[in-house]
């Protein structure tokens, strides 16, 4: 639960960064956000 809370905050903080970066970076970031938590749990 705490892990998910921290993870959600990281996504919120990353949004302005994602806007500034390229689409390719966004896709890589999205891939990590989706698949890494599933592998970890």
Curated annotation (Swiss-Prot):
Name of protein: Uncharacterized protein YthA
Swiss-Prot/TrEMBL keywords: Cell inner membrane, Cell membrane, Membrane, Stress response, Transmembrane, Transmembrane helix
Species of origin: Escherichia coli (strain K12)
Keyword Cell membrane: yes
Chief location: membrane
Induction text: Constitutively expressed, induced at 45 degrees Celsius (at protein level).
Gene name per UniProt: ythA
Membrane topology category: Single-pass membrane protein
Superkingdom, natural source: Bacteria
Annotated Gene Ontology cellular component terms: plasma membrane
Chain segments annotated as transmembrane: 10-32
Compartments reported by the entry: Cell inner membrane
